[in-house]
Amino acid sequence: MVLFSLVATHADIDLETVAQLSNGSSGIAASVLSGSPAVSGAVVLATCNRYEIYGEAPNTDDVEAARAALVAQISAQSGLAEPLVSRSFSTRTGPEVTRHLFAVSAGLDSAVVGEREIAGQVRRALITAQHEGTASSGLVRLFQAASKTAKDVGAQTALGSRGLSIVSVALDLATDLSENPDWSAKKVVVFGTGAYAGATMALLRERGCTDVSVFSSSGRAEGFVATRGGTALDADSLRPAVAAADVMIGCSGSDTRVEADELAQVRAGSAQPLIAIDLALTHDFDPAVGELNGVELLTLESVRLAAPQEQAESLAQASGIVKGAAKAFEQEREARSVDSAIVALRRHTMDVLDAEMEKVRARHGCTAAAEEVEFALRRMVKQLLHVPTVRARELAANGQQDDYVAALEALYGITVEQPGTAAPAAGQAECPVDHKGLESA
């Protein structure tokens, strides 16, 4: 199996294109898995400034076909032309996939370097894929290892110790733009009830803001404020709340958004300035809102440009942890890649042993002598398999697992099956041999 990823982020393309690519992202993995044999598993990581698809293909030759299938599906769901979709994604394979995801999960590839929200988004991406049945075992191990690496970076370095996040930087910008920096005196309207909305509520509370109203186009505001505080808004109460607001924050990314002309009508009788913070990748607020008199619009691009740089020492430490963890993961993955070869060699050896024991039983029956011969042969086979098994692990750790497989085919004529397609163990004969002892070789 081969890991690969398609990556589109704020570092390479504009956020508007990232938003367009991510339209309908929730169904991409399942659609491609059902329609393309080149994709064995897929996990989609979609955040406010990145859209990445991690996949597993049966072999290296299938990666290009897998990429083409994903590009075609994304094009169909987003409405973007296939050539544009294809150009928007960079493709990674093998160890590059591991290094990139580990860096992403640790916050090293974020617009706000060191931010902690991305680690939770990586975890939720895996949970979603598992729920939808699209996460292969290789991808599960990859994402779990990435989450562990993020925890290690948080525990062993000062990266992210300031608690910086996209939300916190946005609120800092809003503070700088306000005539009155005191959040306890501000009226805030939050759009959305997802993870970003939850983080926003927590940070507003930390800054002393108590007058917070929440609107959800899906009707989840009541349940949201029940555990986080604030006032739930419906369609009728939203207009007067926006008219009186000092700040409104978009975190929903829903199909409905606040249009500029609509906001102008609602705010027509208000003399106080309004700061609109749009943290939704697909825009909760019409970009033309920023052209209205008395309205200051902050976007994800504003946050990216204003994000402070982390200290060089913290970055170096975090990068070292990520590099070491990625290398260890790849070594373990390479060791796992020879499991099929080891199983094939054991099966071949056991077939020979079983054939010889059939001859013994045909001559002596299931006698004590036959059992003694069988026991001796099993011990001998276990000893003979020990060195080839150890060498398989050593070669895999050095990236030479293909040499081991080639040697088995050349010396014994053994065809090594792909992981997940191994044939069931051969049936056991009368007076059976207990094969468990060989599994520990």
From Swiss-Prot:
Gene Ontology process terms (BP): protoporphyrinogen IX biosynthetic process from glutamate
Keywords linked to the UniProt accession: NADP, Oxidoreductase, Porphyrin biosynthesis
SUPFAM superfamilies named in the record: Glutamyl tRNA-reductase catalytic, N-terminal domain (SSF69742), Glutamyl tRNA-reductase dimerization domain (SSF69075), NAD(P)-binding Rossmann-fold domains (SSF51735)
Enzyme Commission number: 1.2.1.70
Reactions catalysed according to its record: (S)-4-amino-5-oxopentanoate + tRNA(Glu) + NADP(+) = L-glutamyl-tRNA(Glu) + NADPH + H(+)
Active site: 48
Record pathway: Porphyrin-containing compound metabolism; protoporphyrin-IX biosynthesis; 5-aminolevulinate from L-glutamyl-tRNA(Glu): step 1/2
Binding site for NADP(+): 192-197
Domain of life: Bacteria
GO molecular function: glutamyl-tRNA reductase activity; NADP binding
Coiled coil: none
Residues that hold substrate according to the record: 47-50, 110, 115-117, 121
Family of the protein in this entry: Belongs to the glutamyl-tRNA reductase family.
Subunit structure of this chain's protein: Homodimer.
Name of the molecule in the record: Glutamyl-tRNA reductase
